[in-house]
Swiss-Prot record:
Heterotrimer of A, B and C subunits. The gene is gatB. GO terms for molecular function: asparaginyl-tRNA synthase (glutamine-hydrolyzing) activity; ATP binding; glutaminyl-tRNA synthase (glutamine-hydrolyzing) activity. It is an enzyme of class 6 (ligase). Pfam families: GatB_N, GatB_Yqey. It comes from Prochlorococcus marinus (strain NATL1A). InterPro entries: Asn/Gln-tRNA_amidoTrfase_suB/E, Asn/Gln-tRNA_Trfase_suB/E_cat, Asn/Gln_amidotransferase, Asn/Gln_tRNA_amidoTrase-B-like, GatB, GatB_C_1, GatB_Yqey_C_2, Gln-tRNA_amidoTrfase_suB_CS. This is Aspartyl/glutamyl-tRNA(Asn/Gln) amidotransferase subunit B. Its EC number is 6.3.5.-. Keywords: ATP-binding, Ligase, Nucleotide-binding, Protein biosynthesis. It catalyses: L-glutamyl-tRNA(Gln) + L-glutamine + ATP + H2O = L-glutaminyl-tRNA(Gln) + L-glutamate + ADP + phosphate + H(+); L-aspartyl-tRNA(Asn) + L-glutamine + ATP + H2O = L-asparaginyl-tRNA(Asn) + L-glutamate + ADP + phosphate + 2 H(+).
Length: 491
């Protein structure tokens, strides 16, 4: 039956798989290095050979707990590992070690700033159901196709198998594709600030599965849930959600059934397509892993790890806005990467004004960083040197134009802006007598313009300012030059 007059509510939840940045895997000492030759980081435990026993990597537990704390989750004093049974070539044991009914952390939340196109930015609190630890699976490469269907054969690389994951499951609190993308971006931001993951989506360090349904707003029950996979950017998450919302609403309004299934996002075609029917938890036949003991986290350990947490992005954004007077936009851009925020704070601590520091860092410096594929940690131009340049602008030693002229060399080599200005003879002319002499010459050279100015064409002041800057190669102190010009031209 058509429901074209019905108002639809969208319900979205995200499962975010974060690869924890430990040097070795979750239950073995095998390396986690990315990009090496296939099947070079495997051992008997990874391969599930008989007689091998897993041992939990303590650093994995630390990273998982710190991640949970940053997401305001309650840390369980007691949790356990379970075996999740499924038969697929990327799991050599034919089961995955995960956590089912007793995860390491539950019931948290984060606040997300959402900038919807054409709408005012708003803050939304998103609940987080749980965080649990598990091992990653291997990677299948399908020859002749990007998926199993259509391929001639498949190859499996177990280098990724056994890499530690923290799976973060949100509550179904998201209502738009934009909210889903912003939530995923904030989770990644937090993980990177903590240093527990690099969050590289292209390398699979952070992967998101979207669970999405629609329902008439007059009804309470959720609609049929569809899972979407294969999104490797925040833009893809948003677009996949938006496509799937339209697809499901169209199906319901046409009287069609929406199946509970897993679908893949096709970036090329910009649509989702059916992959397989979705299993329920009972299909995985979970049971406690007999080879791994219970996980216990003492209060002392919790307090120690909590004391090591850095200031997180949301707290920084708030501080930059309330204490430093920055706009919400500037605070958001500066805190997107921890290295940029650290650089900014060092500049301010060295005496750079917050607003001008933000403008230069998010503008010229960020453009240089992006075009050269660097991070602020790798920049030759030190925070103290940028602060020195900003103070020179503020005191009138150089103009903004001269600062931009010397910036390319400072960015590529670093060094003292003051010394560079002296070497190039670019310092501002601040001596009134020198400026007066130049202005007197200009007045003699342009008598007609002087007469027109005195007759009321005050816009000609800009002409004389331009001529003065041309004569001084932009080095005349603008404020002083305007004062003297006004006085001289008035006669």
């Amino acid at each position: 039956m058509s429901e074209s007059n019905v108002s639809w509510e969208v319900v979205i939840g995200l499962e975010t798989h974060v690869q924890l940045g430990t040097k070795s895997k979750i239950f073995t000492s095998a390396s986690t290095t990315f990009g090496d030759d296939p099947n070079t980081h495997i051992d008997p435990v990874v391969c599930g050979l008989p007689g091998t026993l897993p041992v939990l990597n303590k650093k994995v537990l630390e990273y998982a707990v710190k991640a949970a704390m940053a997401l305001n989750l309650n840390i369980a004093s007691h949790s356990k590992f379970d075996r999740k049974q499924y038969f697929y070539p990327d799991l050599p044991k034919n089961y995955q070690i995960s956590q089912f009914d007793e995860p390491i952390a539950e019931d948290g939340w984060i606040e997300v700033e959402v900038a919807e196109k054409g709408k005012e930015t708003y803050v939304k609190k998103i609940g987080i159901e749980r965080l649990h630890m598990e091992e990653d699976a291997g990677k299948l490469v399908h020859a002749g196709s990007d998926q199993l269907s259509g391929s001639t054969h498949s190859l499996v690389d177990y280098n990724r198998a056994g890499v530690a994951l923290a799976e973060i499951v949100s509550k179904p609190d998201l209502r738009t594709g934009r909210e889903a993308a912003e939530y995923a971006a904030e989770v990644r931001r937090i993980m990177r600030y903590l240093g527990v993951s690099d969050g590289n989506m292209q390398e699979g360090s952070l992967r998101c599965d979207v669970n999405i349904s629609v329902r008439p707003t007059i009804n309470d029950p959720f609609g049929t849930k569809v899972e979407i996979k294969n999104m490797n950017s925040f833009s893809a998450i948003q677009k996949a959600c938006e496509y799937e919302i339209k697809r499901q609403i169209k199906a319901y309004e046409s009287g069609e059934e929406v199946k509970q299934e897993t679908r893949l996002w096709d970036e090329g075609k910009q649509l989702t397509k059916s992959m397989r029917s979705k299993e329920g938890s009972s299909d995985y036949r979970y049971f406690p892993d007999p080879d791994l003991g219970p996980i216990e986290v003492s209060n002392e350990l919790k307090e120690k790890w909590r004391s090591e947490l850095p200031e997180l992005p949301a707290a920084k954004r708030n501080r930059y806005s309330t204490e430093l007077g920055l706009s919400i936009y500037d605070a958001r851009v500066l805190t997107d990467e921890s290295s940029m925020a650290t650089y900014f704070e060092k500049v301010v601590n060295e005496g750079g004004a917050a607003k001008s520091s933000a403008n230069w860092i998010t503008g010229d410096l960020a453009a240089y960083i992006n075009s050269n594929r660097l991070t602020f940690d790798q920049l030759h131009f030190q925070p103290s040197e940028l602060a020195e340049m900003l103070k020179m602008i503020d005191t009138g030693e150089i103009s903004g134009k001269i600062a931009k002229e010397i910036l390319p060399e400072l960015l590529s080599k670093g060094g003292s802006p003051k010394q560079l200005v002296q070497e190039r003879g670019l310092g501002m002319i601040g001596d009134p007598k020198v400026i007066e002499e130049i202005i007197d010459q200009l007045i003699l050279k342009h008598p007609n313009e002087v007469e027109s100015f005195r007759s009321g064409k005050k816009k000609l002041l800009g002409f004389f300012v331009g001529q003065l800057m041309k004569e001084t190669k932009g080095k005349a102190d603008p404020k002083l030059a305007n004062q003297i010009l006004n006085k001289k031209l008035q006669g």
